[in-house]
Amino acid sequence: MEKWKERVRIGGYAIIDIGGKQLRVQPGRFYDVRHFPSNLNTRGSDTKVSMGRVLLIRDGSKIDIGSPWLANAVVKGRILHNCFEDKLVIKKIFSKRKTRGSRGCRGSIIRFAIDSIHFNCSNATNK
């Protein structure tokens, strides 16, 4: 019973604004984003990034909410790799013309991992 209680520790998380969407991120996990900032799209894998648009940070029972963002908060991570989404196929059938058409597109996504969340410390620089 004691081992089970140790595994169910509630860790801290942050909500960040990236690519026009809000993500709930935790250290040690990876996430996929469609619209990453353009200057980071061209960089290769294992590039370190820091995201300064932090909306909320929860650490244990303490919650800090920004308006709109927290001042001295930064989420640091690294880009794992660039990849493509599953293909979206669009088919058209024109009645009475015996013609059919299909088009497809694959959006590019970036997979990144979160290393740490900093708030009100010397490591919280938005660079």
Curated annotation (Swiss-Prot):
Keywords: Chloroplast, Plastid, Ribonucleoprotein, Ribosomal protein, RNA-binding, rRNA-binding. GO terms for biological process: translation. It holds the Pfam family Ribosomal_L21p. Its main location: plastid. It comes from the Eukaryota. The keyword Iron does not apply. GO terms for molecular function: rRNA binding; structural constituent of ribosome. It is found in: Plastid, Chloroplast. InterPro entries: bL21-like, bL21-like_sf, Ribosomal_bL21. Disulfide bonds: none annotated. GO terms for cellular component: chloroplast; ribonucleoprotein complex; ribosome. Belongs to the bacterial ribosomal protein bL21 family. NCBIfam families: L21. This protein binds to 23S rRNA. Part of the 50S ribosomal subunit. This is Large ribosomal subunit protein bL21c. It comes from Adiantum capillus-veneris.
